[in-house]
């Protein structure tokens, strides 16, 4: 299920555009996640008071967390599938502390694709979308495998 060198290049090309505004992209991804899948908000105690999209847009904490999420994802993507060292602590915290189900990682992956399509349509055509989908699926599968090792049924 690995990606070719060309596919990784497509992923990293668009990711360079994300890195130019990690906070803005991250905020948009989290708002999209919470609007599309409101049940995911239950996993974020510090965001439970954010009832409207306006509240979410005004939250510096949400913007910061979005930046954190996409920074971590970018570090993993740049490893081009050789990300075991980066996945381990992420899986550990998301399984044991945050209890984030793999399904929620699928949800956020879908939102990431949508945000990239909207913000970078010229650089995120069908080939790049397919490559990013594969990269995010690889990430989720590896997280799910670590979850299983940790005994988390998420």
Curated annotation (Swiss-Prot):
Gene3D superfamilies: 6.10.140.2100, 6.10.140.2110. It catalyses: Fe(III)-heme b-[protein] + nitric oxide + H2O = Fe(II)-heme b-[protein] + nitrite + 2 H(+); H2O2 + AH2 = A + 2 H2O. GO terms for molecular function: heme binding; metal ion binding; nitrite reductase activity; oxygen binding; oxygen carrier activity; peroxidase activity. O2 binds at residue 65. Pfam families: Globin (PF00042). The keyword Transport applies. Its EC number is 1.7.-.-, 1.11.1.-. The keyword Metal-binding applies. SUPFAM superfamilies: Globin-like (SSF46458). Monomeric heme protein which primary function is to store oxygen and facilitate its diffusion within muscle tissues. Reversibly binds oxygen through a pentacoordinated heme iron and enables its timely and efficient release as needed during periods of heightened demand. Depending on the oxidative conditions of tissues and cells, and in addition to its ability to bind oxygen, it also has a nitrite reductase activity whereby it regulates the production of bioactive nitric oxide. Belongs to the globin family. This is Myoglobin. It comes from Mus musculus (Mouse). The gene is Mb.
